[in-house]
């Protein structure tokens, strides 16, 4: 099976690096799917997006992402996020409270929204 080297890095930490069969990300131009052999591109990630990485061993890795860039080269995908959290790390009740709270600022609300989306996307097949 064809693969592409992929890395997901945020300002705080490197989240993952390895071989993937596909990468899906939400950019300011819309959702994009990257497969091995994709044309090189540079995209800006949305403030409340989700990144899905399908690894070569069949694992689906889902992260909530706030801003940053996606760079696709001939043999590599680099996702450089301002902030990223694995769906498995999300405290759902806290994220729901932040999303629904009237005293939550727009940045925190966007982060909570992307975390809840990531949890939902992780449940999908």
Curated annotation (Swiss-Prot):
GO terms for molecular function: ATP binding; proton-transporting ATP synthase activity, rotational mechanism. Residues 94-125 are annotated as: Disordered. Gene3D superfamilies: F0F1 ATP synthase delta/epsilon subunit, N-terminal. It is a peripheral membrane protein. SUPFAM superfamilies: Epsilon subunit of F1F0-ATP synthase N-terminal domain (SSF51344). GO terms for cellular component: plasma membrane; proton-transporting ATP synthase complex. It is found in: Cell membrane. Keywords: ATP synthesis, Cell membrane, CF(1), Hydrogen ion transport, Ion transport, Membrane, Transport. Belongs to the ATPase epsilon chain family. Produces ATP from ADP in the presence of a proton gradient across the membrane. HAMAP family: ATP_synth_epsil_bac. F-type ATPases have 2 components, CF(1) - the catalytic core - and CF(0) - the membrane proton channel. CF(1) has five subunits: alpha(3), beta(3), gamma(1), delta(1), epsilon(1). CF(0) has three main subunits: a, b and c. This is ATP synthase epsilon chain. The gene is atpC.
């Amino acid at each position: 099976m064809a693969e592409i080297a992929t890395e997901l890095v945020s300002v705080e930490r490197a989240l993952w690096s390895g071989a993937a069969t596909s990468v899906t990300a939400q950019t300011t131009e819309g959702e994009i799917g990257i497969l091995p052999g994709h044309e090189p591109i540079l995209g800006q990630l949305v403030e409340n997006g989700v990144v899905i990485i399908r690894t070569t061993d069949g694992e689906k890795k889902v992260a909530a992402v706030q801003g940053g860039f996606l760079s696709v080269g001939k043999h590599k995908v680099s996702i450089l996020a301002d902030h990223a959290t694995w769906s498995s790390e999300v405290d759902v009740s806290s994220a729901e409270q932040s999303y629904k709270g009237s005293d939550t600022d727009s940045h925190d609300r966007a982060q909570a929204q992307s975390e809840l989306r990531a949890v939902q996307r992780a449940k999908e097949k």
